[in-house]
């Protein structure tokens, strides 16, 4: 990730239009902004997972993810599981380790990729 093509700015996340994304179970609501070079933008999201959300895919994209509320369980394709609670984050590179998200309680996340 290279962050050199945009100026200082602020984001009022409540003013960003939400989009819904169905999981295998539950729903994800994203508020998404893009910054930087149009050819390789940085995507920044505020994501909310409903209780019982399970992603409908194994993700191979890299992220920096911070848990703001709730609890997020991430399973890697080798079977390892990690639980994030508020104030915890994870980092993974593109194509490094496929991962799938689940939350029993619901979760609010800040994600950069």
Language-model regions, residue ranges each:
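A short, N-terminal "cap"/entry segment at the start of jelly-roll beta-barrel domains
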Residues: 1-43
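Conserved short histidine dyad/triad with adjacent acidic residue
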Residues: 40-59, 93-96
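Conserved hydrophobic/aromatic positions in well-ordered beta-strands
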Residues: 45-47, 65, 110
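Short, conserved beta-strand element in jelly-roll/cupin
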Residues: 49, 58-74
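Short beta-strand His + acidic residue motifs that chelate non-heme Fe in jelly-roll/DSBH
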Residues: 56-57, 74-75, 92-93, 97-104
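Short acidic-glycine-tyrosine-enriched beta hairpin
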Residues: 78-95
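A short hydrophobic beta-strand segment most commonly corresponding to one strand
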Residues: 89-92, 104-113
């Amino acid at each position: 990730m290279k962050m050199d093509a945009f100026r200082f700015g602020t984001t009022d996340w409540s003013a960003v239009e939400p989009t819904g994304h169905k999981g295998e179970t539950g729903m994800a609501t994203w508020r998404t902004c893009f910054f930087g070079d149009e050819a390789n933008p940085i995507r920044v999201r505020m994501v909310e997972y409903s209780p019982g959300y399970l992603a409908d895919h194994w993700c191979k994209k890299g992220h920096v993810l911070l848990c703001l509320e709730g609890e997020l369980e991430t399973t890697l394709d080798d079977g390892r599981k990690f639980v994030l609670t508020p104030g915890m984050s994870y980092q993974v590179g593109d194509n490094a380790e496929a991962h799938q998200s689940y939350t029993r309680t619901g979760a609010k996340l800040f994600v950069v990729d």
